[in-house]
Swiss-Prot record:
Protein name in UniProt: Protein transport protein sec13
An annotated Gene Ontology molecular function: structural molecule activity
Keyword tags: Cytoplasmic vesicle, Endoplasmic reticulum, ER-Golgi transport, Membrane, mRNA transport, Nuclear pore complex, Nucleus, Protein transport, Repeat, Translocation, Transport, WD repeat
PANTHER family assigned to the protein according to its UniProt record, in alphabetical order: NUCLEAR PORE COMPLEX PROTEIN SEC13 / SEH1 FAMILY MEMBER, PROTEIN SEC13 HOMOLOG
Cited Pfam families: WD40
Subcellular location, record wording: Cytoplasmic vesicle, COPII-coated vesicle membrane; Endoplasmic reticulum membrane; Nucleus, Nuclear pore complex
Gene this protein is translated from: sec13
Organism: Aspergillus terreus (strain NIH 2624 / FGSC A1156)
Any one of the GO CC terms: endoplasmic reticulum membrane
Main subcellular location: membrane
């Protein structure tokens, strides 16, 4: 098993809130209450700070890399209510020493409160970024024909904490004799109203519409994560301030029906994250531990590992 790499000298002057590796695992972006984003190059056990991005006026909560087919693009969201899109531009020069430079290519500032999370859609759906804000609204930014467009709509009355996109292919489409209509644009949001909401894109009206509300948590939903698996079932994990994780399951044969299994913990929970294959769930919370969970043959979720700091 690969050993964890620790970057102890991040250069940030305050708490780090998020860190994300790019598609290839060669770049790491971090963000902090010091209002900056730092980009590191990772090579084996070594790391090197290559850029510090400044543009936010408050703590930066979240960073997210776009798929490389759209270029080297990084999104960030902040307490200042802004979403910034950054792009690495290679210098137009014959000198190999000239390298590249990061520039801010889009500044989205229509939210009226903190933007808590940003999430890129699967690349098959296009260059789409979902944004969750404490103002109760969700926005979806789209890059097309060299320009950015946006939609913004109300989602949760007490604020939106998290957002996660469904896989572009519907569950069961790989193994179905009669596959569905191809690409889907769906995402789930988690709110301070204790609810999860699933949103579907209507290509005729070009709007995102509420298709399902999932109830079960008794406190704020801090994070949601839609599993990337496209086998026979859809899985959504949600982490809550009520010290539980719920794993919601929907079968391809009955896509509107969701059932949930509850995992109980001793502390408030902050984040849930699926493995790339979508079969292992990582959970982290206020006890500084990460636990890994997997579904057994009986359909029950079991803890397979604890990772302590």
């Amino acid at each position: 098993m690969a050993a964890a790499q620790v970057i102890s000298n991040s250069g940030h002057e305050d708490m780090i809130h998020d860190a994300g590796l790019d598609y290839y695992g060669r770049r790491l972006a971090t963000c902090s209450s010091d209002k900056t984003i730092k980009v590191f190059e990772i090579e084996g056990e070594a790391h090197r700070l290559v850029e510090t991005l400044k543009g936010h006026e408050g703590a930066v909560w979240c960073v997210a890399w776009a798929h490389p087919k759209f270029g080297t693009i990084l999104a960030s969201s902040s307490y200042d209510g802004k979403v910034l899109i950054w792009r690495e531009q290679h210098q137009n020069t014959t000198s190999p020493a000239a390298g590249s430079a990061w520039t801010k290519v889009f500044d989205f500032s229509l939210h009226t409160a903190s933007v808590n999370m940003v999430s890129w859609a699967p690349h098959e759906s296009g260059c789409l970024l979902g944004c969750a804000s404490s103002d109760g609204h969700v926005s979806v930014l789209e890059f097309q024909d060299n320009s950015w467009t946006h939609q913004i709509f109300h989602a949760h009355g007490m604020g939106v904490n998290s957002i996660s996109w469904a896989p572009a292919a519907a569950p069961g489409s790989l193994i179905s004799a009669n596959p569905g209509p191809g690409q889907q644009r769906r995402f789930v949001t988690g709110g301070s109203d204790n609810l999860l909401k699933i949103w579907d894109y209507n290509p005729e009206t070009k709007t995102y519409n509420l298709s399902q509300t999932l109830e079960g948590h008794s406190d704020w939903v801090r994070d949601v994560a839609w599993s990337p698996s496209i086998l026979s079932k859809s899985y959504i994990a949600s982490a809550s301030q009520d010290k539980t994780v719920r794993i919601w399951t929907s079968d391809a044969s009955n896509p509107g029906q969701w059932t949930s299994q509850q995992l109980e913990f001793d502390s408030v929970l902050w984040r849930v994250s699926w493995s790339p294959s979508g079969n292992i769930l990582a959970v982290s919370g206020g006890d500084n531990k990460v636990s890994l969970w997997k579904e057994n043959l009986k359909g029950q979720w079991e803890k397979v590992k604890d990772i302590e700091e």
